[in-house]
A protein has these predicted regions:
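Structured core elements
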Residues: 10, 34-35, 66, 107, ...
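Phosphate-binding chemistry for phosphorylated carbohydrates and sugar-nucleotides
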Residues: 31, 187-189, 220
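C-terminal terminal segments
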Residues: 11, 23, 86, 209-260
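Solvent-exposed alpha-helices and their adjacent loops that cap or buttress functional pockets
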Residues: 2-4, 25-28, 41, 56-61, ...
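Short, acidic Gly/Pro/Ser/Thr-rich loop/turn segments
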Residues: 18, 42-43, 72-76, 187, ...
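Short, glycine/charged-enriched hinge/interface segments at domain edges or termini
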Residues: 1-112
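Short glycine/threonine-rich loop/turn motifs
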Residues: 85, 91-93, 100-214, 226
Length: 260
């Protein structure tokens, strides 16, 4: 029929009892936990919460992470370096890492080796952000004005860590905010962020998991540990087409200035 009153419907098969009927408490019962703390509320999760009567809820705010590059020798990535200069690659990498960790990165620029300029940028970042990260000025022989500033106005909790790359790392509190001073070497800055900043940001966001997942793999050749510290080596990872096993080949050079 045309669907109007008086039309007839013909069924091709008998209906089953309960078919196409949604029972009460089919998805969750009273008292059930529909979402755990630390879970990300994705679209499906938002619908699930709404079905349980939660139109809104408490969530962790996105932390703002202030990033400052230190060094008179640094120029913006778009500039052509003059003799004795180098492009600032750390700011781009750290901003991408902060975003990936769940933060809102804020770049405060490149600070030359000038105590007043560095202090002004750091103070501004502390006022406007929840976490401040600098790269450069942390190795022996560098102008380490930031650590001196943190010692003077805040508290330095440690300024070395037993790992490589990234041994020269400063962590402390300034204005009640966490401060992390990373090495200027790109690989060292990357490892320092992954090991220390990423878990901290994830914790600030309220995520249940802080670190990246760990997978087991097999080395394609022997690797000798050179010192009594934790090493993070660059390597390539391939999956064996026959066995499905993950195979790891260490890079020929582990220079902390290299990322590739």
């Amino acid at each position: 029929g045309d669907g109007n009153e008086g039309s007839r419907v013909r069924f091709s098969a008998p209906a089953k009892v309960g078919e196409n009927v949604r029972s009460a408490a089919e998805e969750a019962h009273a008292g059930d936990v529909v979402m755990h703390a630390g879970e990300v509320v994705a679209p499906a999760g938002a619908g699930l919460l709404a079905s349980a009567g939660y139109a809104s809820g408490k969530a962790h705010a996105t932390p703002r992470v202030g990033i400052i590059s230190l060094g008179t020798e640094l120029v913006a990535p778009s500039n052509v370096p003059a003799r004795g200069q180098i492009r600032d690659s750390n700011s781009s990498a750290l901003m991408a890492e902060a975003l990936d960790a769940g933060a809102e990165p804020v770049f405060y620029g490149i600070a030359p080796d000038d105590e007043q300029t560095i202090a002004e940028l750091v103070h501004r970042a502390v006022l406007e952000c929840d976490f401040v990260i600098t790269s450069g000025g942390a190795s022996a022989g560098d102008y380490d004005y930031v650590t001196a500033l943190v010692r003077r106005e805040g508290e330095v909790l440690f300024d070395r860590i037993s790992m490589r790359p990234g041994k020269a790392i400063t962590f402390g509190l300034l204005g009640g905010k966490p401060y992390l001073g990373l090495s200027g070497n790109p690989a060292a800055a990357y490892v320092g962020f992954e090991m220390l900043a990423r878990p901290a940001i994830r914790k600030m966001r309220g995520f249940a998991e802080g670190a990246r997942p760990v997978q087991q793999a097999t080395l394609t050749h022997g690797v000798k540990k050179r010192q009594h510290r934790r090493f993070f080596d660059r390597a390539t990872v391939l999956r064996d087409s026959e066995t499905g096993e993950l195979l790891v080949t260490e890079a020929k050079t582990q220079n902390s200035a290299l990322l590739g």
